[in-house]
Amino acid sequence: MEIIEKAPAKINLGLDIAGKYQDGFHELSMIMASVDLNDYLTITEIAEDKIVVESNNCKLPLNRKNDVYKAAHLLKRRYHISTGLKISLQKKIPICAGLGGGSSDAAATLRALNCLWKLNLSPKELIDVGFEIGSDVPYCIEAGCALISGKGEIVEPLATTLSTWVVLVKPDFGISTKTIFKEIDMATISRVDIPALKEALLANYYEDALQFMGNSLEDITIAKKPFIQKIKGRMIKCGADIALMTGSGPTVFALCRTEKRADRVVNSMKGFCKEVYKVRML
Protein backbone atom coordinates (compact mmCIF):
# COMPACT_ATOMS: atom_id res chain seq x y z
CA MET A 1 0.00 0.00 0.00
CA GLU A 2 1.18 3.53 -0.83
CA ILE A 3 0.19 6.84 0.76
CA ILE A 4 1.01 10.34 -0.48
CA GLU A 5 0.92 13.11 2.12
CA LYS A 6 1.36 16.87 1.73
CA ALA A 7 3.49 18.91 4.17
CA PRO A 8 2.89 22.70 4.01
CA ALA A 9 5.36 25.39 5.07
CA LYS A 10 4.52 27.77 7.90
CA ILE A 11 5.15 31.42 8.70
CA ASN A 12 5.14 33.13 12.09
CA LEU A 13 2.65 35.98 12.09
CA GLY A 14 3.71 36.57 15.67
CA LEU A 15 6.56 35.11 17.72
CA ASP A 16 7.06 36.13 21.33
CA ILE A 17 9.49 34.72 23.87
CA ALA A 18 7.41 34.90 27.04
CA GLY A 19 9.97 33.56 29.50
CA LYS A 20 12.42 30.78 30.29
CA TYR A 21 11.78 27.53 32.14
CA GLN A 22 14.12 26.12 34.77
CA ASP A 23 15.13 23.32 32.38
CA GLY A 24 16.56 25.91 29.98
CA PHE A 25 13.77 25.78 27.40
CA HIS A 26 12.02 29.02 26.49
CA GLU A 27 8.33 29.70 26.99
CA LEU A 28 6.87 30.41 23.57
CA SER A 29 3.82 32.35 22.48
CA MET A 30 3.37 32.24 18.72
CA ILE A 31 0.77 32.50 16.02
CA MET A 32 1.59 30.45 12.95
CA ALA A 33 -0.15 30.14 9.60
CA SER A 34 0.29 27.62 6.81
CA VAL A 35 1.14 28.67 3.26
CA ASP A 36 0.75 26.68 0.07
CA LEU A 37 4.41 25.84 -0.45
CA ASN A 38 4.52 22.10 0.11
CA ASP A 39 6.80 19.11 0.43
CA TYR A 40 5.33 15.75 -0.62
CA LEU A 41 5.93 12.38 1.01
CA THR A 42 5.26 9.05 -0.70
CA ILE A 43 5.26 6.21 1.83
CA THR A 44 5.31 2.57 0.75
CA GLU A 45 5.37 -0.56 2.90
CA ILE A 46 8.22 -2.98 2.20
CA ALA A 47 8.78 -6.55 3.40
CA GLU A 48 12.19 -5.96 4.96
CA ASP A 49 12.03 -4.64 8.52
CA LYS A 50 13.80 -1.32 7.99
CA ILE A 51 13.15 2.35 7.21
CA VAL A 52 14.54 3.74 3.96
CA VAL A 53 14.34 7.50 3.36
CA GLU A 54 15.20 9.04 -0.01
CA SER A 55 14.94 12.64 -1.19
CA ASN A 56 15.49 14.91 -4.17
CA ASN A 57 17.50 17.23 -1.88
CA CYS A 58 21.07 15.97 -1.56
CA LYS A 59 21.75 18.25 1.44
CA LEU A 60 19.33 16.35 3.68
CA PRO A 61 20.56 13.59 6.00
CA LEU A 62 18.62 10.41 5.27
CA ASN A 63 19.43 8.62 8.52
CA ARG A 64 18.33 8.96 12.15
CA LYS A 65 19.11 12.69 12.04
CA ASN A 66 16.22 13.23 9.62
CA ASP A 67 12.89 14.18 11.24
CA VAL A 68 10.96 11.96 8.83
CA TYR A 69 13.08 8.99 9.89
CA LYS A 70 12.65 9.95 13.57
CA ALA A 71 8.86 10.09 13.21
CA ALA A 72 8.62 6.75 11.41
CA HIS A 73 11.02 5.03 13.81
CA LEU A 74 9.18 6.37 16.86
CA LEU A 75 5.76 5.10 15.74
CA LYS A 76 7.17 1.81 14.45
CA ARG A 77 8.89 1.04 17.75
CA ARG A 78 6.04 2.24 19.97
CA TYR A 79 3.35 0.22 18.21
CA HIS A 80 5.50 -2.83 17.43
CA ILE A 81 5.15 -2.64 13.64
CA SER A 82 7.17 -5.38 11.94
CA THR A 83 6.90 -4.28 8.30
CA GLY A 84 9.38 -1.83 6.81
CA LEU A 85 8.94 1.46 4.97
CA LYS A 86 10.31 3.30 1.99
CA ILE A 87 9.70 7.05 2.31
CA SER A 88 10.32 9.28 -0.68
CA LEU A 89 10.52 12.96 0.28
CA GLN A 90 10.04 15.51 -2.50
CA LYS A 91 11.42 18.74 -1.03
CA LYS A 92 10.14 22.11 -2.20
CA ILE A 93 10.35 23.98 1.11
CA PRO A 94 13.86 25.45 1.61
CA ILE A 95 15.82 23.82 4.43
CA CYS A 96 17.20 25.69 7.47
CA ALA A 97 14.92 28.56 6.51
CA GLY A 98 12.53 29.14 9.43
CA LEU A 99 9.64 27.73 7.37
CA GLY A 100 9.15 24.57 9.43
CA GLY A 101 9.86 22.19 6.56
CA GLY A 102 11.45 19.46 8.67
CA SER A 103 8.74 19.69 11.32
CA SER A 104 5.98 19.63 8.71
CA ASP A 105 7.58 16.59 7.05
CA ALA A 106 7.67 14.80 10.43
CA ALA A 107 4.01 15.67 11.08
CA ALA A 108 3.03 14.46 7.61
CA THR A 109 4.84 11.19 8.32
CA LEU A 110 2.89 10.73 11.56
CA ARG A 111 -0.44 11.47 9.83
CA ALA A 112 0.33 9.09 6.96
CA LEU A 113 1.49 6.21 9.18
CA ASN A 114 -1.50 6.67 11.48
CA CYS A 115 -3.62 5.93 8.41
CA LEU A 116 -1.37 3.28 6.83
CA TRP A 117 -1.04 1.25 10.02
CA LYS A 118 -4.62 1.92 11.18
CA LEU A 119 -3.41 3.15 14.57
CA ASN A 120 -6.51 5.35 15.07
CA LEU A 121 -4.55 7.94 17.04
CA SER A 122 -6.42 11.16 17.80
CA PRO A 123 -4.94 14.55 16.83
CA LYS A 124 -4.07 15.07 20.53
CA GLU A 125 -2.21 11.75 20.62
CA LEU A 126 -0.35 12.64 17.42
CA ILE A 127 0.56 16.03 18.92
CA ASP A 128 2.01 14.30 21.98
CA VAL A 129 4.10 12.01 19.78
CA GLY A 130 5.15 14.93 17.59
CA PHE A 131 6.43 16.91 20.56
CA GLU A 132 8.97 14.14 21.20
CA ILE A 133 10.46 14.95 17.78
CA GLY A 134 10.49 18.75 17.87
CA SER A 135 8.73 21.82 19.25
CA ASP A 136 7.13 22.84 15.91
CA VAL A 137 5.81 19.35 15.08
CA PRO A 138 2.67 19.58 17.30
CA TYR A 139 1.47 22.65 15.37
CA CYS A 140 2.20 20.96 12.04
CA ILE A 141 -0.06 17.99 12.84
CA GLU A 142 -3.16 20.00 11.88
CA ALA A 143 -1.44 23.21 10.68
CA GLY A 144 -3.70 26.08 9.53
CA CYS A 145 -3.71 29.20 11.70
CA ALA A 146 -3.07 28.50 15.37
CA LEU A 147 -1.80 29.90 18.66
CA ILE A 148 1.12 27.90 20.05
CA SER A 149 2.28 28.18 23.64
CA GLY A 150 4.31 26.41 26.32
CA LYS A 151 7.33 24.76 24.73
CA GLY A 152 5.35 24.26 21.52
CA GLU A 153 3.10 21.46 22.74
CA ILE A 154 -0.02 23.58 23.38
CA VAL A 155 -1.86 24.24 20.11
CA GLU A 156 -5.07 26.28 19.84
CA PRO A 157 -6.56 26.48 16.31
CA LEU A 158 -7.76 29.97 15.37
CA ALA A 159 -10.90 30.29 13.27
CA THR A 160 -9.91 33.22 11.08
CA THR A 161 -10.95 33.71 7.47
CA LEU A 162 -8.13 36.13 6.72
CA SER A 163 -6.10 35.03 3.74
CA THR A 164 -3.63 37.03 1.75
CA TRP A 165 -0.80 36.80 -0.75
CA VAL A 166 2.55 35.93 0.75
CA VAL A 167 5.97 36.48 -0.81
CA LEU A 168 8.76 34.36 0.69
CA VAL A 169 12.40 35.31 0.21
CA LYS A 170 15.13 32.94 1.37
CA PRO A 171 18.69 34.35 1.25
CA ASP A 172 21.51 31.98 0.32
CA PHE A 173 22.54 31.21 3.90
CA GLY A 174 21.03 29.28 6.79
CA ILE A 175 20.63 30.02 10.48
CA SER A 176 21.08 27.67 13.43
CA THR A 177 17.99 27.91 15.63
CA LYS A 178 19.99 26.75 18.65
CA THR A 179 22.53 29.54 18.09
CA ILE A 180 19.81 32.20 18.01
CA PHE A 181 18.05 30.90 21.13
CA LYS A 182 21.34 30.89 23.04
CA GLU A 183 21.58 34.65 22.40
CA ILE A 184 18.21 35.47 24.00
CA ASP A 185 18.38 37.92 26.90
CA MET A 186 14.96 38.18 28.57
CA ALA A 187 15.88 41.61 29.97
CA THR A 188 16.34 43.20 26.55
CA ILE A 189 14.45 41.07 24.02
CA SER A 190 11.67 42.82 22.09
CA ARG A 191 8.17 41.59 22.92
CA VAL A 192 5.18 40.92 20.69
CA ASP A 193 1.56 41.38 21.82
CA ILE A 194 0.25 37.94 20.88
CA PRO A 195 -3.16 38.31 22.63
CA ALA A 196 -3.88 41.48 20.62
CA LEU A 197 -2.81 39.77 17.39
CA LYS A 198 -5.04 36.80 18.19
CA GLU A 199 -8.02 39.10 18.79
CA ALA A 200 -7.47 40.93 15.48
CA LEU A 201 -7.18 37.66 13.55
CA LEU A 202 -10.33 36.21 15.10
CA ALA A 203 -12.18 39.42 14.21
CA ASN A 204 -10.74 39.20 10.67
CA TYR A 205 -9.37 42.75 10.91
CA TYR A 206 -6.41 42.69 8.53
CA GLU A 207 -5.14 46.21 9.20
CA ASP A 208 -5.32 45.71 12.96
CA ALA A 209 -3.54 42.37 12.70
CA LEU A 210 -0.67 43.99 10.78
CA GLN A 211 -0.05 46.38 13.67
CA PHE A 212 0.46 43.55 16.16
CA MET A 213 2.58 41.20 14.03
CA GLY A 214 6.21 40.83 15.05
CA ASN A 215 9.07 38.48 15.82
CA SER A 216 11.08 38.66 19.06
CA LEU A 217 14.01 36.87 17.40
CA GLU A 218 14.44 39.33 14.52
CA ASP A 219 16.88 41.68 16.22
CA ILE A 220 19.11 38.80 17.30
CA THR A 221 19.26 37.21 13.86
CA ILE A 222 19.65 40.53 12.02
CA ALA A 223 22.61 41.42 14.25
CA LYS A 224 24.31 38.31 12.85
CA LYS A 225 22.96 38.63 9.31
CA PRO A 226 22.25 42.32 8.44
CA PHE A 227 21.26 41.31 4.90
CA ILE A 228 17.89 40.25 6.31
CA GLN A 229 17.13 43.90 7.10
CA LYS A 230 17.90 44.83 3.49
CA ILE A 231 15.39 42.24 2.29
CA LYS A 232 12.73 43.65 4.61
CA GLY A 233 13.39 47.22 3.50
CA ARG A 234 13.22 46.35 -0.18
CA MET A 235 9.93 44.50 0.26
CA ILE A 236 8.31 47.44 2.04
CA LYS A 237 9.62 49.84 -0.61
CA CYS A 238 7.93 47.70 -3.27
CA GLY A 239 4.55 47.96 -1.57
CA ALA A 240 4.35 45.05 0.88
CA ASP A 241 1.89 45.61 3.72
CA ILE A 242 4.45 44.17 6.14
CA ALA A 243 7.76 42.30 5.94
CA LEU A 244 8.86 40.03 8.78
CA MET A 245 11.36 37.30 9.43
CA THR A 246 9.77 33.91 10.10
CA GLY A 247 11.00 31.68 12.91
CA SER A 248 14.67 32.17 13.72
CA GLY A 249 15.26 33.08 10.07
CA PRO A 250 16.65 33.69 7.63
CA THR A 251 13.53 33.66 5.42
CA VAL A 252 11.53 36.89 5.25
CA PHE A 253 7.87 36.97 4.27
CA ALA A 254 5.83 39.87 2.93
CA LEU A 255 2.04 40.08 3.12
CA CYS A 256 0.25 41.73 0.20
CA ARG A 257 -3.52 42.18 0.03
CA THR A 258 -3.55 42.14 -3.79
CA GLU A 259 -1.83 39.81 -6.25
CA LYS A 260 -0.68 42.80 -8.30
CA ARG A 261 1.26 44.13 -5.34
CA ALA A 262 2.65 40.66 -4.58
CA ASP A 263 3.87 40.39 -8.18
CA ARG A 264 5.63 43.73 -7.81
CA VAL A 265 7.45 42.48 -4.72
CA VAL A 266 8.36 39.20 -6.44
CA ASN A 267 9.77 40.96 -9.50
CA SER A 268 11.88 43.24 -7.35
CA MET A 269 13.22 40.45 -5.14
CA LYS A 270 14.12 38.04 -7.95
CA GLY A 271 17.18 40.09 -8.81
CA PHE A 272 18.09 40.29 -5.13
CA CYS A 273 17.80 36.65 -3.96
CA LYS A 274 17.58 33.36 -5.84
CA GLU A 275 14.80 31.76 -3.82
CA VAL A 276 11.59 33.77 -4.13
CA TYR A 277 8.10 32.28 -3.84
CA LYS A 278 4.62 33.74 -4.28
CA VAL A 279 2.10 31.73 -2.27
CA ARG A 280 -1.21 32.07 -0.46
CA MET A 281 -1.85 31.92 3.26
CA LEU A 282 -4.08 28.91 3.85
UniProtKB/Swiss-Prot annotation:
It is an enzyme of class 2 (transferase). The active site is at K10, D136. Transmembrane segments: none annotated. Disulfide bonds: none annotated. Its EC number is 2.7.1.148. It catalyses: 4-CDP-2-C-methyl-D-erythritol + ATP = 4-CDP-2-C-methyl-D-erythritol 2-phosphate + ADP + H(+). Keywords: ATP-binding, Kinase, Nucleotide-binding, Transferase. One of its GO terms (biological process) is terpenoid biosynthetic process. ATP binds at P94, I95, C96, A97, G98, L99, G100, G101, G102, S103, S104. GO terms for molecular function: 4-(cytidine 5'-diphospho)-2-C-methyl-D-erythritol kinase activity; ATP binding. InterPro entries: GHMP_kinase_C_dom (IPR013750), GHMP_kinase_C_sf (IPR036554), GHMP_kinase_N_dom (IPR006204), IspE (IPR004424), Ribosomal_Su5_D2-typ_SF (IPR020568), Ribsml_uS5_D2-typ_fold_subgr (IPR014721). Catalyzes the phosphorylation of the position 2 hydroxy group of 4-diphosphocytidyl-2C-methyl-D-erythritol. Belongs to the GHMP kinase family. IspE subfamily. This is Putative 4-diphosphocytidyl-2-C-methyl-D-erythritol kinase. It comes from Streptococcus mutans serotype c (strain ATCC 700610 / UA159).
